[in-house]
UniProtKB/Swiss-Prot annotation:
Protein name: Prophage NinE homolog
Something else known: Encoded by the cryptic lambdoid prophage DLP12.
Species this chain originates from: Escherichia coli (strain K12)
Family listed: Belongs to the ninE family.
Top-level taxonomy: Bacteria, Pseudomonadati, Pseudomonadota, Gammaproteobacteria, Enterobacterales
Amino acid sequence: MATPLIRVMNGHIYRVPNRRKRKPELKPSEIPTLLGYTASLVDKKWLRLAARRSHG
């Protein structure tokens, strides 16, 4: 059985679980492709979504 001092030194007492973001940030390569859309339409769509997300 470990003494309390050894447990403190090993970090078992003050160990805090890593906080996770609620929504992981999407990388551009992970965005689902929209077939039949031109690049400018897709840009407008994602800019609109980003603007809505930042205000809400």
